[in-house]
Amino acid sequence: MARYHKLGKIPQKRHVQFRNSEGKLYSEELISTIGFDSVYSLVYHCNIPTAVREIEEPYSVAPEIAHPENIKSRKYFGFEVKAEDDYLDSRKTLMVNSDCQISLAAPRKSMKDYFYKNATADEVIFVHKGGGVMHSLYGDLSFATGDYVVIPRGTIYQL
């Protein structure tokens, strides 16, 4: 059964023209991981939230599994992971199964030129050293050493 939660000024019906007091249209955005077949939110923006500048080839972050049935004990030197400029390229997967992927990363730069969305999984980032700001629809979230950053699946963000 559908559950509705109203926050702020919204139209009486969904998916209709909705204008502010000056007659300007609000932009409607559907936020969901499975479209209308799942739980979703309709968000209304004063300004258009996105503008597609270009569509690039899909970027896979799926790990390459070197030893699919490996049960050997291992010791990892996480603070010695090689630093790389790009956030996505810097992620090195250590362990993976059908439910979870554990990676280490040492990005040198922030994601200034792009936003990223993981459409298939939630992300949890533990910050061992450093800090920054995550920009998303939820606002700007500052993080620092010792923080966990939880990013729900389908969230468009920039670090």
Predicted regions and their residues:
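An N-terminus-focused feature that recognizes amino-terminal "leader" regions
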Residues: M1-Q158
